[in-house]
């Protein structure tokens, strides 16, 4: 792997190309996943590869998988690249999805099961079986007692499993990565030292998702002297575009994160990302008959169904008219906020007014050249249903990757 690559983690997020944004219907013969599109089928190059977790495909022990039985059979029969229809130039990585079993006493898998999953998937890279450590020491803080004992227990489990994984995967098709865990920069360093002593040439830094950027950077600074020129370092679950240059400087060679996708529909305000690092709030127009909160209010008689249907229709019509330059910003905002007051209340509507006005006034979708924004226009900033929300997430993924490429281009110019 060359510096710095972005892997997109699979979380069963895809879009239906048959979806009609006016009628809000789809092809009745559509087969989920098989007929849908991943980001790499929408954009020429939104990432360098994909990461798949065993926990997502297989579930936890006897637990529920995110894949249907038919999907799992297809996945294992054809391998990951064929299942995801990945182009030849994209790489593949597998991990265990340790955050899904963080509350268990020990990981729910055996090393042999993990290796079998990686080989059947035909990954390029495989991450050793690990166990998340809770917490990271704050400045002036020092873990002790049972908390420290549990941190050390989980670190020991991870390192023992890493040793076993390295030995048993020697003849496998994938390149092994050993996972480092810690509760401060020193303990992370100890993990990395142990992994390198075992013979690992590639390191993944695990458990960093909850950490502040400063904590991540101080840890990377701590381990940098240990890294050789050919040591590969992967940050599990981390993107942080504002720190791309620092990551590269500190020896990181690859990252993975679903944050750009998740923020499209889980963040309160930062839903639509731009290359400059600014973010916009998507305009919420929930389907009155498909939104659980709204449905409850209608069923309980708090909201009149006919009024809800009328205001929802008015809001959507106003947004489409605005995108066609047939309605003013003021009248569009008025229609949107009328529905907002109904489903979120007067107080919330007033709080969100300025954000909506900024989104609609700036029209960021018109300035974007990505395939999503060009094809669906204002729909990309409407917070409504999975098809719109995921497309906004796909846009965010492409923005992240473009920001990464821009950072890399600046470094190339500096070196020349």
Swiss-Prot record:
Pfam families: TGT (PF01702). GO terms for biological process: tRNA modification. Its cofactor is Zn(2+). Keywords: Glycosyltransferase, Metal-binding, Transferase, Zinc. Disruption phenotype: Mutant lacking the whole dpd gene cluster does not contain dPreQ0 and 2'-deoxy-7-amido-7-deazaguanosine (dADG) in DNA. DpdA deletion mutant (in a dpdD mutant background) lacks both dPreQ0 and dADG. The active site is at residues 95, 256. Binds 1 zinc ion per subunit. The keyword Ion transport does not apply. SUPFAM superfamilies: tRNA-guanine transglycosylase. Belongs to the DNA-guanine transglycosylase family. Part of the dpd cluster involved in the insertion of 7-deazaguanine derivatives in DNA. DpdA may insert 7-cyano-7-deazaguanine (preQ0) into DNA with the help of DpdB. DpdA and dpdB are necessary and sufficient to synthesize 2'-deoxy-7-cyano-7-deazaguanosine (dPreQ0). This is DNA-guanine transglycosylase. It comes from Salmonella montevideo.
């Amino acid at each position: 792997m060359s510096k710095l690559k972005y892997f997109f983690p699979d979380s069963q997020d895809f879009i239906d190309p048959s979806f009609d944004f006016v009628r809000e219907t789809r092809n009745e013969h559509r087969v989920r996943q098989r007929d849908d599109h991943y980001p790499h089928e929408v954009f020429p190059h939104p990432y360098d590869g994909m990461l798949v977790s065993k926990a997502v495909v297989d579930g936890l022990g006897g637990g529920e998988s995110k894949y249907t039985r038919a999907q799992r059979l297809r996945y294992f029969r054809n391998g990951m690249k064929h299942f995801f229809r990945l182009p030849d130039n994209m790489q593949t990585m597998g991990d265990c999805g340790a955050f899904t079993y963080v509350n268990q006493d020990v990981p729910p898998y055996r090393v042999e099961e993990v290796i079998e999953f990686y080989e059947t998937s035909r990954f390029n890279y495989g991450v050793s079986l690990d166990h998340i450590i809770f917490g990271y020491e704050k400045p002036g803080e020092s873990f002790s007692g049972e908390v420290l004992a549990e941190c050390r227990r989980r670190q020991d489990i991870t390192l023992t499993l890493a040793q076993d994984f390295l030995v048993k995967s020697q003849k496998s098709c994938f390149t092994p990565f050993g996972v480092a865990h810690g509760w401060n920069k020193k303990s992370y360093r100890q993990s990395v030292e142990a992994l390198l002593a075992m013979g690992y040439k590639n390191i993944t830094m695990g458990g960093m998702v909850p950490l502040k950027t400063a904590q991540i950077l101080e840890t990377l600074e701590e381990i940098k002297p240990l890294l050789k020129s050919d040591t590969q370092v992967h940050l599990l679950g981390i993107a942080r575009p504002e720190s791309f240059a620092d990551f590269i400087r500190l020896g990181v060679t690859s990252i993975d994160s679903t944050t750009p996708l998740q923020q499209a529909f889980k963040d309160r305000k930062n839903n639509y990302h731009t290359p400059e690092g600014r973010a916009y709030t998507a305009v919420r127009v929930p389907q009155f008959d498909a939104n659980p909160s709204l449905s409850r209010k209608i069923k309980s008689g708090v909201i009149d169904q006919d009024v809800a249907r009328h205001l929802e229709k008015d809001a959507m019509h106003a947004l489409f008219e605005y995108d066609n330059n047939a309605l003013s910003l003021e009248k569009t905002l008025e229609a949107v906020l009328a529905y907002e007051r109904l489903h979120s209340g007067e107080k919330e509507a007033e709080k969100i007014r300025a954000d909506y006005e900024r989104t609609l006034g700036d029209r960021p979708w018109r300035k974007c050249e990505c395939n999503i924004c060009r094809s669906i226009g204002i729909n990309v900033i409407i917070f409504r249903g999975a098809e719109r929300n995921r497309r906004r997430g796909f846009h965010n993924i492409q923005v992240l990757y473009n920001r990464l490429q821009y950072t890399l281009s600046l470094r190339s110019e500096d070196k020349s």
